[in-house]
Amino acid sequence: MHRTKLEQKQPHFDAQKRRKKECKNSNTPFVRPKLELPHGHNKLLLHSCCAPCSGEVMEAIHASGIDFTIYFYNPNIHPLKEYLIRKEENIRFAEKWGIPFIDADYDRQNWFDRAKGMEDEPERGIRCTMCFDMRFEKAAQYAHENGFPVFTSCLGISRWKDMNQINGCGHRAAEKYDDVVYWDYNWRKGGGSQRMIEISKRERFYQQEYCGCVYSLRDTNKWREANGRQKIEIGKLYYSADK
C-alpha cells in the first residue's frame, strides 16, 4: 500500500485517530469467527504486548473454547513506569476472564544490547525485527519447555504494525523446535481492529501513545514538538467510553 510522505513521518500514535475514524464510519456488523488452532491442537500460548491489543484477541480465543495462557515478555517497553502500567492493565483483564498469566523477566539490558547500533532506525525497520525476534524467541522457548504446541501474538492486530514482519519473526522463532508452531492468524479481519477499540473503551484501558521503546518515545515526542503538540505524559491517558 502506498503511503504519503506525511504518513511516513508521523509516529504510530497518530494512526489511532485514523483507526477510530474508520471504526466510527464503518457499517459492517461485527461477526466473531470460530477459531481453530493449526493441526487440530487446542492449547495455545499467547504472547501479549498490552491490554488494548490483546483484549479482542483474548475474547476471541476464549469464545472459541481454546485453552490458552498469556505470556508477557516485553523488555522493549520503557521507561519502567510505562512497562508496569501496561503489564498491570493486562493482568487486570486476564484476571477478569480467569486466564493464566505468565509474567516473564523484564530483560531490559539485554534488549538494549541487541538494539545497539539501531537507535536511529525507523519503526517497521530492522530494530523492530530484532525486537519481535527477541520476544518471540522467548515465547517459543517457553512454549517448547511447557507443553504448548502453538504460540501466537496479539501484535499483529495493530494496523500500524507490519503483519508480514511480525509473522516472519514468529515462524522463525518456532522453526527452532519440532514440537512448536507459530499461528499467523489475521486478527484484523472480521472486524477485529474495530472490536479492539470497542473493548478498550469498555474496559477503560490505559491508552499508550507510542510503541514502547525509548526510541519510539523519542521520535514521537520530536514529531509532537514539531507540530505544536505536548509531549507524552506517562500514565495519563486512558480510553473513555464517551469518546
UniProtKB/Swiss-Prot annotation:
Keywords of this entry: 4Fe-4S, Disulfide bond, Iron, Iron-sulfur, Metal-binding, Oxidoreductase, Queuosine biosynthesis, Redox-active center, tRNA processing
UniProt binding sites for [4Fe-4S] cluster: C49, C50, C128, C131
Region of interest (Disordered), residue spans: 1-30
GO MF annotation: an example: epoxyqueuosine reductase activity
Pfam families the record matches: QueH (PF02677)
Pathway this chain belongs to: tRNA modification; tRNA-queuosine biosynthesis
InterPro entries reported for this sequence: QueH (IPR003828)
Reaction(s) catalysed by this chain's protein: epoxyqueuosine(34) in tRNA + AH2 = queuosine(34) in tRNA + A + H2O
Function: Catalyzes the conversion of epoxyqueuosine (oQ) to queuosine (Q), which is a hypermodified base found in the wobble positions of tRNA(Asp), tRNA(Asn), tRNA(His) and tRNA(Tyr).
Protein's name in the database: Epoxyqueuosine reductase QueH
Organism whose genome encodes this protein: Histophilus somni (strain 129Pt) (Haemophilus somnus)
